[in-house]
């Protein structure tokens, strides 16, 4: 037990501190903005009732999004039956990964569920959500089309997010993103916080998850492949152009160079263009590549071996 605890401390130490700093900044700006708005309305006697409403709305929306929605989500997943849960019988590899990975990372083992989107069978989400104990929802498309090591890699990233305390904020961003516009207005204080997190914190949090997942997997090509396939599976324009997982593998093997085949060239061009346009994701890949080629990465592997 002592050895595991010491290893966890060393493991988390390789996360860049900028993510924590930016997360605190987003929280501070959100609290300051809400208190300032409440105080401004309370300053004027005619608006004091509005100030009370704003403050109550802030508390209610926070409780609703951070507590009620996650609890309802867990109940819905549990209600689907044991055939949708990740267990030793139906998904033994993934279940073993969650058990051993949780111990290695130093978090409580999350509940695991297979998620089938009613409107789209090709659901490739691999995400962690909820309040402790967390749960991991894996799309049926991910279990079907991703290579098992790639699915393992994405699941380990979820455990890393849990280790770094990212789950509540990631869940918040995802829930607000999926809400209709009218619902976002109803929880506008939380929508403001989600916007601040997305602008200031999200990219750094994802980059840290990439770094620490790589320390667990110890295979840069596998991590890159998993990240790129996750990117393609959630990029509507690439899917519409027929860019698939085979094109990701071709892209990695060719080092980003265009192939001679017309169909391959078109797919590679579309993928390369999408990567250039998504500055945040491209920066994550570049940062990961830089770190892999650095002495710090080699030293980290030796320390955690």
Task: Name each region found by the language model.
Residues 1-7, 131-144:
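Short, charged cytosolic
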Residues 138-153, 200:
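Short pre-active-site segment immediately N-terminal to the catalytic Zn-binding motif
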Residues 98-102, 152, 158, 202-223:
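An active-site-proximal "capping" alpha-helix that borders the catalytic cofactor pocket
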Residues 39-43, 172-196:
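A hydrophobic membrane-anchoring feature enriched in long, contiguous, low-charge segments
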Residues 1-122, 298, 302-305:
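Hydrophobic or amphipathic, alpha-helical segments that drive membrane association/targeting
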Residues 80-95, 194-215, 275-276:
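Active-site metal-coordination segments of metallo-dependent hydrolases
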């Amino acid at each position: 037990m002592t050895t595991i605890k010491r290893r966890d401390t060393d493991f988390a130490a390789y996360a860049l501190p900028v993510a924590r700093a930016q997360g605190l900044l987003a929280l501070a700006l959100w609290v300051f903005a809400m208190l300032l708005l409440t105080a401004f309305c309370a300053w004027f006697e005619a608006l004091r009732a509005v100030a009370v409403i704003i403050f109550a709305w802030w508390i209610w929306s926070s409780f609703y999004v951070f507590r009620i929605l996650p609890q309802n989500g867990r109940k819905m997943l549990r209600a689907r039956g044991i055939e949708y849960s990740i267990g030793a019988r139906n998904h033994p590899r993934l279940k073993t990964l969650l058990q051993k990975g949780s111990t290695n990372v130093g978090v409580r083992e999350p509940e695991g569920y297979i998620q089938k989107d009613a409107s789209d069978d090709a659901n490739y989400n691999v995400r962690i959500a909820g309040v402790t104990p967390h749960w991991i929802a894996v799309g049926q498309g991910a279990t079907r089309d991703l290579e098992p090591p790639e699915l393992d890699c994405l699941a380990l990233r979820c455990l890393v997010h849990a280790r770094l305390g990212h789950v509540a904020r990631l869940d918040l961003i995802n829930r607000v993103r999926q809400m209709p516009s009218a619902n976002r207005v109803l929880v506008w204080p939380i929508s403001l916080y989600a916007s601040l997190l997305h602008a200031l914190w999200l990219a750094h949090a994802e980059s840290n998850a990439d770094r620490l997942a790589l320390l667990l997997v110890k295979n840069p090509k596998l991590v890159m492949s998993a990240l790129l396939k996750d990117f393609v599976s959630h990029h509507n324009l690439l899917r519409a152009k027929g860019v698939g997982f085979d094109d990701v593998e071709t892209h990695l093997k060719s080092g980003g160079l265009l192939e001679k085949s017309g169909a391959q060239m078109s797919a590679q061009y579309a993928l390369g263009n999408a990567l250039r346009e998504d500055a945040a994701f491209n920066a994550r890949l570049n940062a990961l590549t830089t770190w892999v080629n650095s002495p710090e990465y080699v030293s980290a592997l030796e320390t955690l071996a």
